[in-house]
Amino acid sequence: MRLILLSGLLLLGTFLVNGHDADPEGEVLNSVLLTLMKLQKEFTNLFHAFLTVHKARSFGSGSERLYVSNKEIKNFEALKVICKQAGGQIPSPQLENQNKAFANVLERHNKEAFLVVGDSGNFTNWAAGQPNKADGTCVKADKQGFWHSTSCDDNLLVVCEFYFIL
């Protein structure tokens, strides 16, 4: 959208530099200005619609991060690829409300899913007796949101995290 606006401004600048010989009444210039104004209004409407949907999606969980499943069952390596292609990342809840939002997805699907805890800051939600490296080097969350060591080869629910910085 911004590219279209910039293109319109470039056209406007071209008309201003070349003078008004080709458009003595200013019809083309007025048309370009009108189109730019319509595009700006459309961009603003789309931006507000996006914000409304984002706020609605995050309202119930209290988290600005969205956790979404495509209902597939995959191992950790496949999950990395899927989340990256979708524009998200492997879940990495860093606050209790984020972990709760993630756990809500798992509870709804009655499944477990991988997560990354390396950058979780001060928040952890390890189950009793965990982490246990003997179980594996990856981490999964159960349906209640408790974390467990697991094998990266396990096949778990695909859940990706999406975080919008506005």
From Swiss-Prot:
Lineage: superkingdom: Eukaryota
C-type lectin domain residues: 46-161
Keyword annotations of the record: Calcium, Disulfide bond, Glycoprotein, Lectin, Phospholipase A2 inhibitor, Secreted, Signal
Any GO molecular function: phospholipase A2 inhibitor activity
Main location: secreted
Localization per Swiss-Prot or TrEMBL: Secreted
Glycosylation sites: N122
GO cellular component, as recorded: extracellular region
Secretion signal span: 1-19
Tissue: Expressed by the liver.
Keyword Glycoprotein assigned: yes
Keyword Cell cycle in record: no
Cysteines engaged in disulfide bonds, as pairs: C83-C160, C138-C152
Family, similarity comment: Belongs to the alpha-type phospholipase A2 inhibitor family.
Subunit and interaction comment: Homotrimer; non-covalently linked.
Role description: This phospholipase A2 inhibitor binds directly phospholipase A2 in the presence or absence of calcium.
Protein name as catalogued: Phospholipase A2 inhibitor A4/A5
